[in-house]
Amino acid sequence: MEQVVIVDAIRTPMGRSKGGAFRNVRAEDLSAHLMRSLLARNPALEAAALDDIYWGCVQQTLEQGFNIARNAALLAEVPHSVPAVTVNRLCGSSMQALHDAARMIMTGDAQACLVGGVEHIGHVPMSHGVDFHPGLSRNVAKAAGMMGLTAEMLARMHGISREMQDAFAARSHARAWAATQSAAFKNEIIPTGGHDADGVLKQFNYDEVIRPETTVEALATLRPAFDPVNGTVTAGTSSALSDGAAAMLVMSESRAHELGLKPRARVRSMAVVGCDPSIMGYGPVPASKLALKKAGLSASDIGVFEMNEAFAAQILPCIKDLGLMEQIDEKINLNGGAIALGHPLGCSGARISTTLLNLMERKDVQFGLATMCIGLGQGIATVFERV
């Protein structure tokens, strides 16, 4: 079976969804920009040699509809002979795109693929057109479709206090801002055109959504966002609303060596699981355990983790049950996470994987794990190994 390697991984800056940098930039353009950039950064691979493009996107309507993967590829002037498909596993879409491409390469059906994902929540809100079947309520609580309430449930079940959530959220912003100031994101962010507050066209090379002024004291003043009477989850301890895209060049190890391209990491194992929709945020726990089992590893073998921060109330129970509470500052989301950077749904799986690869290199660790929860009760995880 072929070894699957990541040759390159990049992303756009994360733009604010409400009146932000990409308010006049379409999702297809963000995607096409990264496709062109990956090919330009790796000229040894001819675009015509790509076997497929897998692109995650959740709200596949309006500008994100009608197979945005193909639309973006055509905009990027990828040869017409290269196919493209849009992948949807809700929050895990672009990580699923990676898994789909990896399996194709493992079986010998492909040698080189572009994978990634995009979400422009500013143009296509996450709830746009959603119409749940009324019959679902026979088997699943209605609140299971309300992500904030599932986070509230996890917080109560695991004893996660408001103070713990506020502290974790403040940490996310502080870590993300420190990473920005130290140029830790420089290797992953591709400068991307947008508009500043005055409408002037400019190149953005930083994440617009980070709030460096965030403090625990300021977060403590916010009202609960989802359960006004008894809740502990606020807007400040939830993932920010942002627009962005991320992309990776995935190849068989043999093809990368043939072309003289240096692999950055191997895909060591992959896992996806289902869980109770009412506690959808717990999905990373069984997904990570399964991925570790497939890799023949334990959590203690992993040097750094990227865990998508849907909510502080959601990620803290996952950290706790993976036995990592004492290692948060050494291993977990060292450059902040979605609370600070935002969670553009179809982009996030590739985004956290891209950040993870850079952290693995900077910290000089052998193994890294990226994982995320998925709405309606799923979890997805990938173990990477440095080459």
Curated annotation (Swiss-Prot):
User: What GO biological process terms are annotated to this protein in UniProt?
Assistant: fatty acid beta-oxidation; phenylacetate catabolic process
Q: What is its EC number?
A: 2.3.1.16
Q: Which UniProt keywords apply?
A: Acyltransferase, Cytoplasm, Fatty acid metabolism, Lipid degradation, Lipid metabolism, Transferase
Q: Name one GO molecular function term.
A: acetyl-CoA C-acyltransferase activity
Q: Where in the cell is it found?
A: Cytoplasm
SUPFAM superfamilies, alphabetized: Thiolase-like (SSF53901)
Q: Which domain of life is it from?
A: Bacteria
Q: Reply yes or no: does the keyword Transferase apply.
A: yes
* GO CC terms: cytoplasm
Name the pathway: Lipid metabolism; fatty acid beta-oxidation
User: Which InterPro entries is this protein grouped with?
Assistant: FadA, Thiolase, Thiolase-like, Thiolase-like_sf_Thiolase, Thiolase_acyl_enz_int_AS, Thiolase_AS, Thiolase_C, Thiolase_CS
Catalytic reactions of this protein: an acyl-CoA + acetyl-CoA = a 3-oxoacyl-CoA + CoA
Pfam families hit by this protein: Thiolase_C (PF02803), Thiolase_N (PF00108)
Task: Indicate the residues that form the catalytic site.
Answer: C91, H343, C373
Under the subunit heading, UniProt states: Heterotetramer of two alpha chains (FadB) and two beta chains (FadA).
Say which family it is in: Belongs to the thiolase-like superfamily. Thiolase family.
Its job: Catalyzes the final step of fatty acid oxidation in which acetyl-CoA is released and the CoA ester of a fatty acid two carbons shorter is formed. Involved in the aerobic and anaerobic degradation of long-chain fatty acids.
Protein name per Swiss-Prot or TrEMBL: 3-ketoacyl-CoA thiolase
Q: From what organism does this protein derive?
A: Shigella flexneri
Q: What taxonomic ancestry is recorded?
A: Bacteria, Pseudomonadati, Pseudomonadota, Gammaproteobacteria, Enterobacterales
Q: What gene is behind this protein?
A: fadA
